[in-house]
């Protein structure tokens, strides 16, 4: 921040709020109308848009590149405007992979090659691959030490399995909310959500899921592959989130199709 101040000749007096007291402090600021000039924070502040300045004209005058970027995108206008039709807040515009994709499935291509298997494209093929990883010693060490599929229970962050709901017609997110046919929908109220859980429960019962997946901490997950070439499918922004021995052995699993072709 010091370098930014020197480059712009603008000094900023920062007010740091501990995460534990963030919500209370922000609520007091808005309720007493004692706001700083600008706030970097969570989206829930946007509900107080009437207390925030209108940015539309200022953006056009002082931020033409930002304005042009917004106008070039179909997805930004809906997110930008408050209920009064004005812009009061700005998104971060951070399109790093971890902000575009909550989590990706990565499969051990070397294991596929060792067993003469093709990349799975459907949930049935995916299950058959996991069974082969469990039963056919894909790492070739003569031991039943393979973990067909590992992830961690940290909903909405890397290492999780939200994308396995897609083949059942549900776009699962950390907030459990998605848009369906133009309407905001609660994912856990969809039949496809329960169908997905039932299918995944079957994988767990057959020993195709890592038995410790739901209790792994971030550090434990990061060292899951430390024992050697023992991981078949992992979840994360990158395969090395699970501590795989050789990340170059892993390839992204394509969007899987459900039994009726749903993706």
Predicted regions and their residues:
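Extracytoplasmic/secretory soluble proteins
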Residues: 1-263
């Amino acid at each position: 921040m010091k370098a930014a101040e020197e480059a712009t000749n603008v000094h900023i007096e920062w007010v740091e709020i501990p995460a534990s007291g963030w919500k209370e402090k922000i609520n007091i600021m808005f309720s007493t109308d004692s706001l700083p000039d600008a706030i970097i924070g969570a989206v829930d502040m946007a509900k107080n848009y009437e207390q925030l300045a209108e940015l539309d004209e200022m953006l056009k005058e002082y931020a033409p590149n930002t304005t042009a970027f917004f106008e070039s995108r179909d997805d930004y206008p809906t997110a930008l405007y408050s209920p009064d039709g004005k812009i009061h807040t700005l998104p971060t515009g951070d399109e790093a992979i971890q902000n575009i994709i909550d989590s990706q499935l990565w499969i051990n291509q070397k294991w596929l090659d060792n067993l003469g298997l093709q990349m799975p494209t459907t949930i049935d093929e995916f299950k058959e691959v996991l069974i082969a990883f469990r039963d056919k010693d894909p790492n070739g060490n003569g031991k039943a030490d393979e973990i067909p599929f590992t992830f961690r229970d940290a909903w909405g962050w890397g290492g999780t399995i939200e994308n396995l709901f897609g083949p059942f017609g549900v776009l699962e997110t950390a907030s459990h909310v998605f848009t369906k046919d133009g309407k905001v929908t609660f994912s856990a109220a969809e039949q496809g959500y329960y169908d997905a859980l039932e299918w995944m429960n079957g994988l767990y019962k057959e020993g195709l899921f890592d038995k410790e997946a739901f209790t792994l901490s971030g550090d434990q997950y990061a060292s899951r592959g430390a024992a050697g070439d023992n991981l078949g499918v992992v979840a994360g922004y990158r395969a090395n989130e699970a501590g795989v021995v050789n990340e170059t052995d892993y390839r992204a699993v394509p969007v899987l199709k459900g039994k009726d072709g749903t993706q």
